[in-house]
Amino acid sequence: MVVCAILACPAAFAAVQDKQQSKGDAPKISEGEQKAIEKINAASGVAEKLKAAAEYVKKNSKSQMRPRVAAYVSDQIAKVTDHNQRIGFVENFTKTFNLPEEADLIKPTLIDSLIGSNKFEEAFNEGSKHIERKPDDVIVLTQVAWAGANQARAQQQPNQPPPAALLKNASAAGAKAVEMLEADKKPEGMDAAFWGNFRNSWLPRLYQAQGVILYFSNDKTGAKDKLEKAAGLDPYDPPTLLMLSDILNTEYTKLGERYQAERKQALLNEALQKMDELIDWLARAAAATEGNAQYEKLNKDIMDQLKNYYAYRHEGKTDGLKELIQKYKKP
C-alpha cells in the first residue's frame, strides 16, 4: 500500500493579514496622498494596484497610512488564486514595501503559494527563517510543519530517512503550533471568526503532519498516536486513513510472522485482534476514497485487501462488508 498520498491542504493561509489590521480611525492626510490612495483602490487588478502603490510609497514613504496601504495591497495579492502569479506579485510587493514588518505581512501568502506549487523545501526554508525572528507566529509555524511533512514524504528513499534536521525542525514547529491551537491561544488582533475557522481546519492537519514526520523518523507507534488524533478530529481524510491502514498492516504482518515462527496461541489471538483493527481502518479508508478519482487505484487496492481479510474472519464470506463501509461514509 502506498504510505501516503500528497497531503491535501484543507484551507489556504492567504488573507490572514487583513484579519490583523487596526480598525482605528485613519490619520489625517493631504489631498495629494488621498488621491494616491484612491488611485490604488480604483486600479484594476493586482498588477495595476502594485504600480499605483509603488508611486504612493515614493512620495509618502513616511506616512502613517503606509501600513494600511501595505496591508490592503497584501490582502489583494492573497486573493489571487494562481500560485505562480501570486509569487510574482509577492516579489514585486517586497520591492516596494521593504520594511521588516511589511515582509512579515506578506510572508504567509508567499509560503502558502510555495506549498500550493509543491515547492515544499522552499516553503520550509522561508518559514524556518521567519520563525527564528517570530517564534510565536502560529500561522507560519503551521506552514513549516505542513511543508516539512510534505518534504519528508517527497524525499523518502528506501532505507534512507529524510534529513534529521528537517524532521527535527518540522516536528518542533508542529508541536508548538498544536500547543497554541489546543490552548486556543488566539494571536492578538486576529479576528475571532478567522481564528476559529483556522483552528478547526488545521488542528487535524497538524496532527497528521506530526504523524507523517514521526513515520519517517521511524517512530511508527508515535505516528499512529498522532494519526489517530487526526482521524478523531477529521474521520474522512484519505491520507490519514491510508497511513493508519499502512501502519496497522505492518503491525499485523509482524505479528503473523512471529506466530508462524513461535506457534503460540497468545500470538495468534493478538494477530487476529490486530487484523480486526486493520479491517476497521481499511473500511474507513475505502469509504473515504470511494468515488474519488484521485484515489481510484488506491481504492481498488484497499478493497482487494479488505475483502481478503474480511472473508478470512467471516468464514470465507463478505456478507456485511458493504454495510461496514457504508457506516464510515461521510454524511
Regions found by a protein language model. Give the residues of each.
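The tetratricopeptide repeat
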Residues: 35, 68-72, 105-106, 140, ...
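Short coil/linker segments at helix-helix boundaries
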Residues: 47, 79-80, 84, 88, ...
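Terminal, low-structured helical/coil segments at or just beyond the last alpha-helical repeat
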Residues: 19-27, 186-193, 250, 258-265, ...
